[in-house]
Amino acid sequence: MAAKDVKFGNDARVKMLRGVNVLADAVKVTLGPKGRNVVLDKSFGAPTITKDGVSVAREIELEDKFENMGAQMVKEVASKANDAAGDGTTTATVLAQAIITEGLKAVAAGMNPMDLKRGIDKAVIAAVEELKALSVPCSDSKAIAQVGTISANSDETVGKMIAEAMDKVGKEGVITVEEGTGLQDELDVVEGMQFDRGYLSPYFINKPETGAVELESPFILLADKKISNIREMLPVLEAVAKAGKPLVIVAEDVEGEALATLVVNTMRGIVKVAAVKAPGFGDRRKAMLQDIATLTGGTVISEEIGLELEKATLEDLGQAKRVVINKDTTTIIDGTGEEAAIQGRVAQIRQQVEEATSDYDKEKLQERVAKLAGGVAVIKVGAATEVEMKEKKARVEDALAATRAAVEEGVVAGGGVALVRVAAKLASLTAQNEDQNVGIKVALRAMEAPLRQIVSNAGEEPSVVANNVKAGDGNYGYNAATEEYGNMIDFGILDPTKVTRSALQFAASVAGLMITTECMVTDLPKGDAPDLGGAGGMGG
């Protein structure tokens, strides 16, 4: 086992604080409308330019191992805030630095670290309740656009695009961000359920100008098996032909004689048919077939549950207003499934999302919810260069996460004002002893730090602005972009309650642990291996 280097008491805390300050100082230059960019060098390719706190934090490793421990613990704050709310990483880092700095001063002055931590925790619990009380629901498109704009560094086009996407696909719909090919941002919306499987034969195409199959009010046959024998399908085909409607077949595969017969029927105009493979593989395919069945009011023909294709009737088939199939995708528009059944299925999948452990599974389940509940919107980010593209895409993703958080828990006044108001309301909060009271004061003083940092980045004097804001009440604050005082809600400067709450909770959690640190242990640096001397008896 390698030898260890151990530091105690103040020595350890001073080193740790130095690491915290290096990381936090690098991150906090990005805060606010006048925050600056940080350039990150990469081992290959062009440097990355970013204004995203967590991206900066992730890049920082310090040479001194004790300082690095401090930096890594604050990096954890930014990562946790990013995971929970998708934004607010810089705010969380600034809060953590402020609590640690003030807390360690109190420890150096002889306060009991455990009582300080209890005081900080008590203040944060009370502050979260106050934030919830200040929060107002974020339901209209204008508020959603404002939240997106602020999170995307005052880029109004991004805010409007996110609001439009949410309008189109609903609050539950999936909105994804991709790199576009042009200079302009674009929004693509797919209404209805779309999955990535195209037609099995180009002979099904009935719209040659678009290269697509478009069927109006078709029946939809869902089969969890390979279909190669046409005899199995004859009863269904005859029933559909009598009804005079088209048929879409979604099966594990349709091949051989069965596919050839369907093509011939289509070309002769006996019955309009199109066949596609079922989406997904294995268990996910079974689940997605069941989703389509719920959406269209049909039944999945599966031998596992004793249903045979030969015995299928029109009652087993789903229906939709329209189905569009092209080379790579199939879109089912306005399925005729019962609303109650669809909502039940959505609730069931949501439960699976809660229980899912991997991010990949969660993402796939969320996509299924969106396909059932509304639709899918894709924001394609446009930019002139690769470097700008990466920076802009990160901003749009942050803005999207912030708007989701706002819809979930509401919004409070932005620009650090909400935390200043909360601190003022909790000024009379007390605890069991004097050391805990100092802990409460440490937390309340730290709540001013985001406002002060925003002002500092805008080139103004933080103390003057902080005092002016404290002299006002409600949503009165300072707009750093225009250097005006006024109502933050009227200015359109809103922060999602969830983002502010998460930032405070994670910052206090890690800061409280760091304040109570008394000893730090790390590996001693390995010395260079000694040179081997010349072998005996050999001339030099």
UniProtKB/Swiss-Prot annotation:
Cell location: Cytoplasm
One GO cellular component term noted in the UniProt record for this chain: cytoplasm
Any one Pfam family match given in the protein's UniProt record, by short name: Cpn60_TCP1
A GO molecular-function annotation: ATP-dependent protein folding chaperone
UniProt xrefs under NCBIfam families: GroEL (TIGR02348), PRK00013.1 (NF000592), PRK12849.1 (NF009487), PRK12850.1 (NF009488), PRK12851.1 (NF009489)
Highest taxon, organism lineage: Bacteria
HAMAP family associated with the record: CH60
InterPro entries found in the cross-reference section: Chaperonin_Cpn60_CS, Cpn60/GroEL, Cpn60/GroEL/TCP-1, GroEL-like_apical_dom_sf, GROEL-like_equatorial_sf, TCP-1-like_intermed_sf
EC numbers: 5.6.1.7
Subunit structure: Forms a cylinder of 14 subunits composed of two heptameric rings stacked back-to-back. Interacts with the co-chaperonin GroES.
Species per Swiss-Prot/TrEMBL record: Pectobacterium carotovorum subsp. carotovorum
Positions that bind ATP: 30-33, 51, 87-91, 415, 479-481, 495
Listed GO biological process terms: protein refolding
Keywords in alphabetical order: ATP-binding, Chaperone, Cytoplasm, Isomerase, Nucleotide-binding
Catalytic activity: ATP + H2O + a folded polypeptide = ADP + phosphate + an unfolded polypeptide
Primary role: Together with its co-chaperonin GroES, plays an essential role in assisting protein folding. The GroEL-GroES system forms a nano-cage that allows encapsulation of the non-native substrate proteins and provides a physical environment optimized to promote and accelerate protein folding.
Similarity annotation: Belongs to the chaperonin (HSP60) family.
Protein name: Chaperonin GroEL
